């Protein structure tokens, strides 16, 4: 029963509803601390902590944000951190330097390990009850981090939300909107951010003449400031940079798809080591995979394929595809009040199972 009430606390404080708003009148808000961790390279990096009412020897949850300039300040991640702290879990939101720069790099795996080691050494947490969740691109990167021998005392629960199985397939979806779960083909309107992530990361592999720093500055402004400085930046660029930006942001032509494919061929050896499809056989721990059915950044089919591949190898995996969520946002729910209640119940049961070690 204790697990049930804690699960209910999390769900009611994550999904907007009148009951959750009413409960805030009777609950003391978690204390929020700005702390830090040190990377292998010696850099001190900010880490936000949500503290529950109980101060000593409590379970812990590390939430690794995805690739976003908001990093540890991301609104949806902070909403989840607040909810889990209200349920009695000390919750950590680390900044991963490259991911804040909208870069998907091998170095981020090292920094995720640095975070885990920092949390594990704390005196105010139960070291046997640490759960970790990686969001978006950070999900599969953290799964790989768990293969490192420094995490031999693995998290009590390893969670990946809205992430990819095959990095190359996920990036191709960002351009074409086409995806497959291995049995059925789907076509969606891909989120613009996916295109920006692709080109921002791999500009130097394009054959087009351009100034990468100019184009990256423009793309980063699109995601960090909603393009607030875009017109000013664009006006100052030479013509070849403008032409490339136009292709990246809005061109859906066959030429762009071919341009992307040329880049893919060059970077395959970079993408493969970051893809679970490459290290499936090394995964020897239970995995919890969640995905939004309406996700247009990384399609839910990536999680379906990941689950199927693990099951075929006899590995333990638990999966939940939510019709309530897209990538990090809650979509309008069109199945009526009863449908919403049933979906929340399904979600709650999965969260209760997934976070059982720390609730």
What does each model-found stretch correspond to?
Residues 5-59:
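N-terminal cap/lid segment of alpha/beta-hydrolase-fold proteins
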Residues 52-85, 93-96:
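Short, surface-exposed "cap/lid" segments of acyl-processing enzymes
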Residues 283, 289-291, 295:
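Short beta-strand/loop motif that positions the catalytic acidic residue
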